[in-house]
């Protein structure tokens, strides 16, 4: 099982060990979810100001948030799916706020790496099509998160 993950650290604060942890966690999630080898995504670490801009411009919410997912497989009205014969599956992009990650880790009383892993996995599951808009969907998605984090050994 092998994902192709491009990491971008606009904050220049994220240690290599955290990048490696996220890579391994998302590989585990991909394996458990049956994601094809060679599937691509990007993970970008930003500050609160940058994620606030993205949240405002794309979601109409003028405030910082912890993680935003841009799923390339979400089809809008009138869009046509283009599938190339030998093209890898492209899931999309994850944007994670490092300051919010630190704040939430402290707020929830667990480690920075646990919160960072949780946010990366949460965003990854959104890229795979999971959501939490209804109680039923939330139960399914949060159950998946707990199962994968547990299998990976990243507990509260």
Swiss-Prot record:
The gene is ybeY. The keyword Transferase does not apply. The keyword Ubl conjugation does not apply. One of its GO terms (cellular component) is cytoplasm. It is an enzyme of class 3 (hydrolase). It comes from the Bacteria. This is Endoribonuclease YbeY. Belongs to the endoribonuclease YbeY family. GO terms for molecular function: metalloendopeptidase activity; RNA endonuclease activity; zinc ion binding.
């Amino acid at each position: 099982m092998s994902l192709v993950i491009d990491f971008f650290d606009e904050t220049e604060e994220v240690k290599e060990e955290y990048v490696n942890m996220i890579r391994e966690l998302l590989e585990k999630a991909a394996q458990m979810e049956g994601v094809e080898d060679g599937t691509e995504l990007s993970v970008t670490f930003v500050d609160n100001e940058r994620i606030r801009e993205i949240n405002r411009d794309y979601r109409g919410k003028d405030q910082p948030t912890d993680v935003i997912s841009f799923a390339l497989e979400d089809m809008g009205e009138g869009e046509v799916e283009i599938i190339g014969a030998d093209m890898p599956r492209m899931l999309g992009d994850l944007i994670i706020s490092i300051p919010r990650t630190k704040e939430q880790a402290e707020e929830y009383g667990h480690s920075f790496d646990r919160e960072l892993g949780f946010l990366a996995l949460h965003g990854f599951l959104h890229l795979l099509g999971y959501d939490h808009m209804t109680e039923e969907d939330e139960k399914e998605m949060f159950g998946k998160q707990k199962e994968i984090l547990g299998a990976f050994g990243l507990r509260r």
